[in-house]
């Protein structure tokens, strides 16, 4: 009985972070809406600067729970620049935590507010979040023939013209890799083989459209491409097999003791501009990822297994940087919920904010 209670309590470790992260969303959206109204007649750069600061506050709260609260050990391989840069961030995609890994790296460059994502189109219907991500610079894209490159190009060029700092996160695989999804993996490998490309084992065949449009639209604005390969330690089983990477709730329940991040900075001038050449280049980058992952999971040498080649640095994010965000947003939300009018405003923001956000996407379409 006692053991069952302990196990149940352990499995509920995600509850507090979930309540605070989701519970503060209306508070955050109200703060952003107020700033949006006040800045209507101000220069666009001023609005963007403050919006980036607001975004940084919320994402620091996310990092408090996903780094400080979980106590995950982050091992960084490669030299992450200390200065801010305008970049496209390319990574393997296997977990819902992947977007937070991008936050982790950006925070170490003091560029957290500049992070913007290329997202699956269906995510725009997420209550409150879907609408706000678009306002912050996120781009929703559809797959294959439905991909609207003109819309993406137009939005990115508007940011370039405005001088907006960009830390654009793209997952070129388009969907999460999962070793148990054998049909998806087989289809991806067949797609590569039919086009004379190397067949990949631990990643899916990358798609070029979003990456090419992003690079082509922002090449005069970019400093580099960040090529990132991530492994969530704790899901390997040996012999090239591993279980599913942790979900966000599993990660918050501390089911990932170590996070291995291999970082490679590629100067903008080293990236081919023509689409077919870039397609080959991108696949070659994923071949490198695949070799890194094969070495990590399948190396015959036990000393080389469960780590990337080269030296790693144990990177820590100070709680002094993240805890203030928890206190600020948590306190503002608590104050709002203390009064009847505040509770009505809070619930109204959840309801009408979601409906108006969906309506905005419908009208925009």
Swiss-Prot record:
Q: Found in which tissues?
A: Widely expressed.
Membrane-spanning regions, if any? Answer: 15-35, 345-365
Catalytic activities: a 1-acyl-sn-glycero-3-phosphate + an acyl-CoA = a 1,2-diacyl-sn-glycero-3-phosphate + CoA; 1-(9Z-octadecenoyl)-sn-glycero-3-phosphate + tetradecanoyl-CoA = 1-(9Z)-octadecenoyl-2-tetradecanoyl-sn-glycero-3-phosphate + CoA; pentadecanoyl-CoA + 1-(9Z-octadecenoyl)-sn-glycero-3-phosphate = 1-(9Z)-octadecenoyl-2-pentadecanoyl-sn-glycero-3-phosphate + CoA; 1-(9Z-octadecenoyl)-sn-glycero-3-phosphate + octadecanoyl-CoA = 1-(9Z-octadecenoyl)-2-octadecanoyl-sn-glycero-3-phosphate + CoA
CDD domains in the cross-refs: LPLAT_LCLAT1-like
Q: What membrane topology does the UniProt entry give?
A: Multi-pass membrane protein
Q: Which GO terms describe its molecular function?
A: 1-acylglycerol-3-phosphate O-acyltransferase activity
Q: Give the location in the cell.
A: Endoplasmic reticulum membrane; Nucleus envelope; Mitochondrion
Q: Name one GO biological process term.
A: CDP-diacylglycerol biosynthetic process
UniProt short sequence motif HXXXXD motif, positions renumbered to this chain: 93-98
Q: What is its EC number?
A: 2.3.1.51
Pathway annotation: Phospholipid metabolism; CDP-diacylglycerol biosynthesis; CDP-diacylglycerol from sn-glycerol 3-phosphate: step 2/3
What family is this protein classified in?
Answer: Belongs to the 1-acyl-sn-glycerol-3-phosphate acyltransferase family.
Role, per record: Converts 1-acyl-sn-glycerol-3-phosphate (lysophosphatidic acid or LPA) into 1,2-diacyl-sn-glycerol-3-phosphate (phosphatidic acid or PA) by incorporating an acyl moiety at the sn-2 position of the glycerol backbone. Acts on LPA containing saturated or unsaturated fatty acids C15:0-C20:4 at the sn-1 position using C18:1-CoA as the acyl donor. Also acts on lysophosphatidylethanolamine using oleoyl-CoA, but not arachidonoyl-CoA, and lysophosphatidylinositol using arachidonoyl-CoA, but not oleoyl-CoA. Activity toward lysophosphatidylglycerol not detectable.
> What's written under domain?
The HXXXXD motif is essential for acyltransferase activity and may constitute the binding site for the phosphate moiety of the glycerol-3-phosphate.
Name of the featured protein: 1-acyl-sn-glycerol-3-phosphate acyltransferase epsilon
- Species of origin reads Mus musculus
Q: What is the lineage of its organism?
A: Eukaryota, Metazoa, Chordata, Craniata, Vertebrata
State which gene encodes it.
Answer: Agpat5
């Amino acid at each position: 009985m006692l053991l069952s209670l302990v196990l149940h309590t352990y499995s509920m470790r995600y509850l507090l972070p979930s309540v605070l992260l989701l519970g503060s969303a209306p508070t955050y959206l109200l703060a952003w809406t107020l700033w949006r109204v006040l800045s209507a007649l101000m220069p666009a750069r001023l609005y963007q600067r403050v919006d980036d600061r607001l975004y940084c506050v919320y994402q620091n709260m996310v990092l408090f729970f996903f780094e400080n609260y979980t106590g995950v050990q982050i091992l960084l391989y490669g030299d992450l620049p200390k200065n801010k840069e305008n970049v496209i961030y390319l990574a393997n995609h296997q977990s819902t935590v992947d977007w937070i890994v991008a936050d982790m790296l950006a925070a170490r460059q003091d560029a957290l507010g500049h992070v913007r994502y290329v997202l699956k189109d269906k995510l725009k219907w997420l209550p409150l979040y879907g609408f706000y991500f678009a306002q912050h610079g996120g781009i929703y894209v559809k797959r294959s023939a439905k991909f609207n490159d003109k819309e993406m190009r137009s939005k990115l060029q508007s940011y370039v013209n405005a001088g907006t700092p960009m830390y654009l996160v793209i997952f070129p695989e388009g969907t999460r890799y999962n070793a148990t999804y054998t049909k998806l993996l087989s289809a991806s490998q067949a797609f590569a083989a039919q086009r004379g490309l190397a067949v990949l084992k631990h990643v899916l065949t990358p798609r070029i459209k979003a990456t090419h449009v992003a690079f082509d639209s922002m090449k005069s604005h970019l400093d580099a491409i960040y090529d990132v390969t991530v492994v969530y330690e704790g899901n390997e089983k040996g012999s090239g097999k591993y279980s599913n990477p942790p979900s966000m709730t599993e990660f918050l329940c501390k089911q990932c003791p170590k996070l291995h991040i291999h970082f490679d900075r590629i100067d903008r001038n080293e990236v081919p501009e023509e689409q077919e050449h870039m397609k080959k280049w991108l696949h070659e980058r994923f071949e490198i990822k695949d070799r890194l992952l094969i070495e990590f999971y399948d190396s015959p040498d036990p000393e080389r297994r469960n780590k990337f080649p080269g030296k790693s640095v144990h990177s820590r994010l100070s709680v002094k940087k993240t805890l203030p965000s928890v206190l600020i947003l948590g306190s503002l939300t608590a104050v709002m919920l203390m009064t009847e009018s505040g509770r009505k405003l809070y619930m109204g923001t959840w309801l009408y904010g979601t409906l108006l956000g969906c309506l905005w996407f419908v009208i925009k379409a």
